[in-house]
Amino acid sequence: MSPQPPSPTSAPAGSLTHLAVAGYRSLQQLTLPLGVSPLGGQPHGGLTLVCGANGCGKSNLYRSLGLVAAAARGDLVAALAAEGGLPAVFWAGPERTTREMHRGEQPVQGSSGRREAARLRLGIAGETLSYAIELGYQSDDHTSAFVLDPEIKREWIWAGGPFHPRSLLVQRTGAVVERCGDGGRAVPIALEVSPHESLFTAASDPLEAPEVFQLRRTILSWRFYDSFRTDRQSPARSGRIATRTPSLAADGGDLAAAVQTILEIGDAEAFQAAIADAFPGCHLTVDTSAPLFQLQLHQPGLLRPLEVTELSDGTLRYLLVAAALFSPRLPPLLVLNEPENSLHPDLLAPLARLIAAVAERTQVWVVAHAETLITALEDGSDCRLLRLERELGATVLPGQTVLERAAWRWPA
């Protein structure tokens, strides 16, 4: 029996339509269309599948979306510092390339000086609200030891997808955040904002700036799952004191509580069907007799269930992905980075069916490397496939038309 999409809670409306990145690692200038949630009534399903050879920039896309979430949380500078700071994350290639460079007739080389200041730009376009941020080096105080810290130069929030000055709702320039009122009149709503603080934390009052509050709340509800640890000391095997858990933690440490929550208030029947689809004849229970819940996998032919400490890495990782996807509280965006890691090839078809089922209810972004999973998702679901390549060190989407690239416009 193939898994059915979880049913208790629908995802919020307002799906992403585009992700735009400029100046970040291999993403010199890239705009990607995203599969839109079927709740929005769009032609594409809710699944975006990003694939490509090693080194093509898949992980950079995953990280760039995570940086947008970090801006909403208020820890963007810390997130960039964890990646090595601006010197490590800026596009390392030339500011401009020539036709001769692309044809191999001229070596790739930079000019004697930059025409424009180095900038890192991130942007998301949504059905209802869109956002962009621009960061760069500090422009003054060169005596400080923190001169290489990222500085937020500008931010914008506007209505709808494609940017137009008349659709601008909130903008931040330097230390001032303004709300754009009727007739283009700008009203300051935050002054003396730190160059390291996003408008999401500086001006998120629901009455004074409802757009900021609404978009921040949406972004904070995104969920990212990247390479669950399954070693003997991993949080997923160690567990933690159980409380009701409508969303699995990013480290999987609350797996038993998350499964018990699914069994109590989620779609328990579909969840067990998904487990049986991957492991025929098996089902899950949770021992709730102690504050530290114990997950148990029942297998045909065994006289007792297996506890999480006894499971193989691949089995545990599949259970973690299943628990994340069957959350009773679906997010507006669910991002999975190479969920097929450490899984036996026989589990990839059930995994594809599980992902496709959840994409019927909310927007799902999958970064995948295994061709078996990619083919299964292509064949079994309505997905938008983005197969990336590298050209002169830059990540590109082959075949993208001028009109498709023009669907995103950076605010000025």
Predicted regions located by residue number:
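C-terminal lobe/lid and adjacent interdomain/linker elements of RecA-like ASCE P-loop ATPase modules
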Residues: 2-15, 349-412
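Electropositive, glycine-dotted interaction segments
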Residues: 119-265, 269, 273
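Catalytic acidic motif of RecA-like/P-loop NTPases
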Residues: 25, 66, 312, 340-341, ...
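The start of beta-strands in P-loop NTPase/AAA+ ATPase cores
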Residues: 46, 332-333
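Short, hydrophobic/aromatic-rich segments at coil-to-beta transitions
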Residues: 13-19, 113-122
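Conserved ABC ATPase signature
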Residues: 260, 273-326, 333-334, 339-348, ...
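Conserved catalytic network of the ASCE P-loop NTPase/AAA+ motor domain
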Residues: 41-43, 113-114, 325-329, 356-360, ...
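Pre-Walker A-like glycine/lysine-rich segment at the N-terminus of P-loop NTPase domains
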Residues: 2-102
